[in-house]
Amino acid sequence: MVILGVNVDHIATVRQARKTFEPDPVMAATLAILGGADGITIHLREDRRHIQDRDLKILREVVPCELNLEMAATEEMINIALNIKPDMVTIVPEKRQELTTEGGLNVIELKDSLKEAIKKIKDAGIPVSLFINPERNDIECSKDIGADMVEIHTGYYSESRGDVQLKELERIKDAVAYSISLGLKTNAGHGLNYYNVKSIAAIKGLRGLYIGHSIIARAVLVGIEKAVREMKNLIKEACINA
């Protein structure tokens, strides 16, 4: 069964809009787990635009399932990861001007610095995933530099429609199959929602899906537990019928 990691960054986005204490992403994470989330994901950005260091520290103490820390491969973030020891680290590209992560890592161009970062994190006993585009060259390079996992970027699939979306789906299927053949645990995420998730969840061998915005957006209307439960049910249906 494909696991569901729920990203609670957008809870923190609402809080930081007023620089106040609520809503609390820690409380949101607890409710997400009650709704069936298999893990919690947060992205601690260099500019601290949403998740704060305090959130990461408390989540590490209270989350009983997988805590996935998304981060850039900077010295500051590596040191934080080594100190907090999340259950896994996902290295992502990061630009100050972007609203959200816009694409996968340029693994080939950054392979030397990524290899060094991966080694430091893995030496502390923390598995490392790389957020990459559905390209075989990036998958091969991820394997070569020591990644334990990859997360296939589904943003282009999520943003497209019709024949273009079907083409993107085939790219993702090929990437997942190739990644698994190389021995990498393989996840997917970015832009997935209640209308497009089933085709991705049905891909054979996929380990997990990491979803944030669509779940939090629905949670505003129906509550976090129900929003997570509805997404979890869609994933289960897709896996059963695959």
Curated annotation (Swiss-Prot):
Location of this chain's protein in the cell: Cytoplasm
Keywords from the UniProt entry: Cytoplasm, Pyridoxine biosynthesis, Transferase
GO function terms (MF aspect): pyridoxine 5'-phosphate synthase activity
Any Pfam family the entry gives: PdxJ
GO biological process entries: pyridoxine biosynthetic process
Ligand binding (3-amino-2-oxopropyl phosphate): N7, R18, G191, G212, H213
The protein's enzyme class: transferase
Catalytic activities: 3-amino-2-oxopropyl phosphate + 1-deoxy-D-xylulose 5-phosphate = pyridoxine 5'-phosphate + phosphate + 2 H2O + H(+)
GO CC terms: cytosol
Assembly, per entry: Homooctamer; tetramer of dimers.
Function: Catalyzes the complicated ring closure reaction between the two acyclic compounds 1-deoxy-D-xylulose-5-phosphate (DXP) and 3-amino-2-oxopropyl phosphate (1-amino-acetone-3-phosphate or AAP) to form pyridoxine 5'-phosphate (PNP) and inorganic phosphate.
Protein's name in the database: Pyridoxine 5'-phosphate synthase
Organism encoding this protein: Thermodesulfovibrio yellowstonii (strain ATCC 51303 / DSM 11347 / YP87)
Lineage: Bacteria, Pseudomonadati, Nitrospirota, Thermodesulfovibrionia, Thermodesulfovibrionales
Gene: pdxJ
